[in-house]
């Protein structure tokens, strides 16, 4: 089966909807790939979803390489995009390229994603020039949560929307192969989608984008009843299913139902009789 590449994703502009989700380890990558994901994002959301932090600012390049490598070991058909964490692309173009290269060389990613508009163009230029495909990210950019004053929809005012459209055009000029639009009014996302020649992938940006992405734990209902944003639609409730399964296991342990004879390794009778004979030794307890 052909592995998805960044040029293949770019060529999907205006075509079949792009299917994207996150994965942070080997088993979730296998699940996402079996389900037919076109893109697997190893997101910095691993900080919240897997590691229990309050925001995405707590992970560094080492953490992202670790989780990206786990996803890559699943050898998915999907394109693996490694998220560049906070402060890994803010200092200089040279440092940005080196950090992106770590996600590719050590992590096994085939592309990287970074947040921001025109002020990130110099960094994107450098990474693209190093022949590493870049996915852009506009709108509600979680790494800017402190500057934005929280997780708020972006582009609701006309001037802010105009600036976002200009940012999208600048990202395309810098060489991105796609753009994630997060927490953006649907009409603004539609304008950007119509304006740029690369696919847009929405998360809380309406149905008019070229594709959609949701965090895999949100889709599967693995949050255990935690708050979900308005744009999330759970398609399962695996957290409750998992609790029920473990409760049944613990009940079976307590009552002695588990393990059964079929779930137990057995010694041949002949060997057992020999072992009983050895029990006459003073060093072996009698049984």
Predicted feature residues:
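Alpha/beta enzyme core
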Residues: 2-236, 240-274, 278-287
């Amino acid at each position: 089966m052909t592995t998805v590449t960044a040029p293949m994703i770019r060529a999907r502009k205006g075509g079949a909807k792009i299917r994207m989700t996150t994965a942070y380890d080997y088993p979730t990558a296998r699940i996402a790939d079996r389900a037919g994901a076109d893109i697997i994002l190893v997101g910095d959301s691993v900080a919240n979803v897997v590691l229990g932090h309050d925001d995405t600012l707590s992970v560094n390049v080492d953490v992202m390489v670790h989780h990206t490598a786990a996803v890559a070991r699943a050898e998915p058909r999907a394109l693996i995009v490694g998220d560049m964490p906070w402060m890994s692309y803010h200092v200089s173009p040279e440092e940005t390229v080196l950090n992106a290269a770590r996600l590719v060389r050590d992590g096994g990613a085939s592309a990287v994603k970074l947040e921001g508009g025109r002020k990130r163009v110099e960094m994107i230029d450098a990474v693209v020039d190093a022949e590493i495909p870049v996915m852009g990210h506009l709108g509600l950019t979680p790494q800017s949560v402190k500057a934005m004053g929280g997780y708020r929809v972006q582009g609701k005012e006309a001037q802010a929307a105009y600036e976002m459209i200009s940012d999208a055009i600048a990202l395309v000029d810098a060489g991105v192969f796609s753009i994630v639009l997060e927490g953006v009014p649907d009409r603004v996302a539609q304008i950007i989608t119509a304006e740029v020649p690369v696919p847009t992938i929405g998360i809380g940006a309406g149905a008019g984008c070229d594709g959609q992405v949701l965090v895999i734990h949100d889709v599967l209902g693995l949050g255990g009843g935690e708050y979900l944003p308005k744009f999330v639609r759970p398609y399962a409730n695996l957290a409750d299913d998992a609790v029920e399964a473990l409760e049944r296991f613990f009940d079976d342990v307590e009552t002695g139902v588990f393990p059964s004879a079929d779930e137990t390794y057995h010694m041949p009778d002949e060997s057992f009789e020999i072992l009983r004979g050895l029990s006459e030794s003073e060093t072996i307890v009698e049984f």
